[in-house]
Every structure is written in C-alpha cells, then in structure tokens.
C-alpha cells in the first residue's frame, strides 16, 4: 500500500457535455476519470481515493497499532475503515480490536467493522457509539465534510462545524494518549478551534496528503496524545 502512481496515470479523458448534466457534475466526473488515485483505489480494492489520505497520515505519524479501538465518523463509502482494519490487523479476531463506523449513507459490510447508519447529530447516536465501544477509544477519526456549494467561505465554515462536533465527541471517548484526526478546509476561521485542540492534546499538526487534490483547501488536523 504505497502512493507510487506508476501505471495509474492514463491519457486525459474528455467528458462530453450533456443537457442532463450540470457544469459542476461534469467537472466532478472529469476529475474522477482523470484521477490516478481513483484508478489505483479501484485496482487495489479500496472503496475510495480517501483511503490513500489515511495511509499517508499513518505513514507520517505512525498512529495505528494492533489491538486498538477506533471510531470512524463520516465513514461512507468505507475507505478509511478499510485502511484502519488493515493497519490494526482486525482480521486476527483479537478481542481488543474494534472499529465503529457511522454515516448517514449505507456502506457495504467490511470485515471486523461494526457500522451504524445513523446521523451523528441525532440525540442518541453518541450513546450508541459509546456502548458499542465498550471502553475508551484509541483513535477518533473524521473525514466528515458538508456538501460543498462552491462558495469557499461557506464550505469552510460548514466543515469546520462538523470538525468541532467531532472534536467534542473525541474528548468524551478517547483514552489518555489517544489521537484525533479530522478534515478541515482552510479559510481563516479555524484558529479558535485549533487553540481548543492544542489545550487538550500534547501535539497538534496540520497535514495535506499528496493524495489530496492540489486545488482543494482541505487539510487534516492531526492531534496526538490526548492529555
């Protein structure tokens, strides 16, 4: 599982215009068809190109180890849960391995991953996750993002609010020295949240994986070792 893209870069594929397709959907389709990470994910059996973002984060910060309990927020279509399952060797049926995934959208089952199709913001969802964990989590990770509308400031704020909710939840369920990973979009309003995170974790870093599209303002907040 490397990020070597040799053999995955195809010739540029043009997308024909269609009366039924909006400009934004045509642009998205064009990016997908010409994205080497999309092709690589398909060939290597990952649900999405986002899998490589988490692999890069782990390669940089060495977060995952066997016998961990992990919560994956905004899990669909399941790429991050797939990666986590491989990295903690969930297939060895260790009683200490546990991955709890949640999303509004349904995902195909993943071995050794317990999935709940729920709204994270519903009143009883946090308690459901806590009960399923049966103990404290080692990692809470969130790739949640709001549906983008193309207005950078609005997209930034909406995704930042999701990150804040994930952070507050992480404080409740993480064990001491646990880690928190979350997507944010750069836009200037994130500093207040970053200051909160720094008060609760010993090390806080920003990281933009090479598998993140260069034109995107997304970065990942990596908070290590909860106090």
Swiss-Prot record:
It is found in: Cytoplasm. The gene is rlmE. S-adenosyl-L-methionine binds at residues 78, 80, 103, 119, 143. The lineage of its organism: Bacteria, Pseudomonadati, Pseudomonadota, Alphaproteobacteria, Rickettsiales. It is an enzyme of class 2 (transferase). This is Ribosomal RNA large subunit methyltransferase E. InterPro entries: RNA_methyltr_RlmE, RNA_MeTrfase_FtsJ_dom, rRNA-MeTfrase_E, SAM-dependent_MTases_sf. PANTHER family: RIBOSOMAL RNA METHYLTRANSFERASE, RRNA METHYLTRANSFERASE 2, MITOCHONDRIAL. GO terms for molecular function: rRNA (uridine-2'-O-)-methyltransferase activity. Its main location: cytoplasm. Keywords: Cytoplasm, Methyltransferase, rRNA processing, S-adenosyl-L-methionine, Transferase. Belongs to the class I-like SAM-binding methyltransferase superfamily. RNA methyltransferase RlmE family.
């Amino acid at each position: 599982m490397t990020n070597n893209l040799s053999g995955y870069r195809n010739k540029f594929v043009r997308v024909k215009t269609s009366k039924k397709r909006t400009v934004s959907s045509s642009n998205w389709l064009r990016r997908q068809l010409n994205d080497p990470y999309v092709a690589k994910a398909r060939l290597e059996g990952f649900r999405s190109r986002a899998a490589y973002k988490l692999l890069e984060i782990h390669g940089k910060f060495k977060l995952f180890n066997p016998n961990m309990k992990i919560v994956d927020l905004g899990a669909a279509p399941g790429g991050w849960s797939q990666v986590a399952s491989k990295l903690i060797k969930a297939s060895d049926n260790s009683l200490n391995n546990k991955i709890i995934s949640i999303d509004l959208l349904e995902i195909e089952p993943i071995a050794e991953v317990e999935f709940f199709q729920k709204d994270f913001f519903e009143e009883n969802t946090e308690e459901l996750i806590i009960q399923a964990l049966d103990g404290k989590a080692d990692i809470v990770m969130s790739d949640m993002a709001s549906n983008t509308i193309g207005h950078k400031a609005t997209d930034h704020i909406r995704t930042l609010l999701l990150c804040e909710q994930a952070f507050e939840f992480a404080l409740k369920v993480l064990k001491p020295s646990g880690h928190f990973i979350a997507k944010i979009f750069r836009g200037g309003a994130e500093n207040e949240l970053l200051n909160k995170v720094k008060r609760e974790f010993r090390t806080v870093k920003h990281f933009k994986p090479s598998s993140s599209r260069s034109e995107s303002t997304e970065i990942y907040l990596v908070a290590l070792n909860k106090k």
